[in-house]
C-alpha cells in the first residue's frame, strides 16, 4: 500500500513539473534541439533536412547551411 501511494505521489510531482513548462518554452526547446539558428534563416549540419520554418536546408559546407524556400 505504501508503494502505491509513493508511486502516485512521484507521478503527480513529475506531471506538475511537466505542466510548469510553458508551451512557448517547450517549442523553443524543441527548435534548439533541432539545431535551428535565429530568424529561421540558417541551420547547422546537425539540424537535419528541415529548418525551423520548415524550409529545406542546403548544405554549403559542413559548418554553414542555408535554408531554401
UniProtKB/Swiss-Prot annotation:
N-terminal signal peptide: 1-20
Localisation per UniProt entry: Secreted
Tissue expression per record: Expressed by the venom gland.
Disulfide bonds: 36-52, 43-57, 51-67
SUPFAM superfamilies: omega toxin-like
GO cellular component, one term: extracellular region
Primary residence: secreted
Key words of the record: Amidation, Disulfide bond, Knottin, Neurotoxin, Secreted, Signal, Toxin
Pfam families: Toxin_7 (PF05980)
Modified residues (Leucine amide): 68
Single GO MF annotation: toxin activity
Its job: Insect active toxin causing rapid but reversible paralysis in crickets. No activity shown in mammals. Does not show effect on mammalian voltage-gated calcium channels.
Similarity-based family: Belongs to the neurotoxin 01 (U2-agtx) family.
Domain notes: The presence of a 'disulfide through disulfide knot' structurally defines this protein as a knottin.
The protein's name in its UniProt record: U2-agatoxin-Ao1i
